[in-house]
């Protein structure tokens, strides 16, 4: 049997909807209404937007509710659709940064030429000049050989 003090205590009463909501707020934090959320702008608005409600007329048919969906793609990834029979989506990912100094071979050639020019300037011109003449002769022979190979390939392609 319950006593009068036990019946009045809050533990003995069954939970109402209002008490349940208070318990949820304590557990999950306060519920924020939509107007407060839009003013605050901390939470993004819903992506499902309803169209403006029309005035209800008794003779008019009920109109279907249309929804507009707003999507925002991240700026780092852009999706491009290929205009082909099969419309597949490809993802473009930013590539590796390229060096601004040019190719490594070009840089090495510039360094070699600078060393040779420094050698000529310092007075050891005779051995360096002989080496440069030999290098020039070998490069000329290589260029002539490459030209001969290219012309032979071209003639072979014209015969086909």
Swiss-Prot record:
Residue spans crossing the bilayer: 101-121
Topology term for the membrane: Single-pass membrane protein
Basic and acidic residues: bias regions: 12-25, 33-42
Key word Transmembrane present: yes
Disulfide bonds: none
Presence of keyword Phosphoprotein: no
GO cellular component: plasma membrane
Ranges for region Disordered: 1-69
Keyword annotations from UniProtKB, A to Z: Cell membrane, Membrane, Transmembrane, Transmembrane helix
Localisation: Cell membrane
Main location: membrane
Pfam assignment, any one: DUF4658
Stored InterPro entries: DUF4658
Identification of the protein by name: Nutritionally-regulated adipose and cardiac enriched protein homolog
Organism listed in the record: Homo sapiens
